[in-house]
Amino acid sequence: MRYMLDTNICIYIIKRHPPQVLHRLATLAQGSAVMSVVSYAELRAGLEIQTANRAQDERVLALLISRIPVLPFTESGAESFGVLRAAVRDRRRDTMDQLIAAHAVSTGVTLVTNNDADFKDYPGLKVENWALNT
């Protein structure tokens, strides 16, 4: 099974907390976890905004993307976005989350997030939460 890591899960990996996220990631075969280019964009934006520890965080993010492939957003993702946006007409939902959901659906992977509620009701989207203590 392949997994797409939501932005919050990537942040947990970078911060090395909570430990259960790191443990679950460690159980996967190489290449089983991927990141959407949308999550990478969110991480880059966060890095640009902050001033403290900038050089260190640049290195950590570079290490993360060297180990977790960043998938490009394709026409298939755009088509999935249209379907999901039409299915869930709540325009208050975050567009970035909708793009990540569409990307996961279009690539046939399970989305890993700690924000389950943000991704409910999207048709065809499979979600797991590795941050829960189980």
List the model feature ranges, each with a label.
Residues 1, 101, 105-134:
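Acidic, PIN/NYN-like endoribonuclease modules and their adjacent C-terminal/linker elements
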Residues 1-35, 47-63, 133-134:
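Short, well-structured N-terminal submotif of metal-dependent ribonuclease cores
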Residues 6-7, 21, 43, 81, ...:
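Generic structural signal for small/hydrophobic residues in well-ordered secondary structure
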Residues 9-10, 39, 77, 100, ...:
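Alpha-helix capping/helix-boundary segments
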Residues 33-40, 114:
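Substrate-recognition element of Asp-dependent hydrolases with the DxDx(T/V) motif
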Residues 64-66, 123:
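Short, structured coil segments at secondary-structure junctions
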Residues 68-112:
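Active-site neighborhoods of divalent-metal-dependent phosphate/nucleic-acid chemistry enzymes
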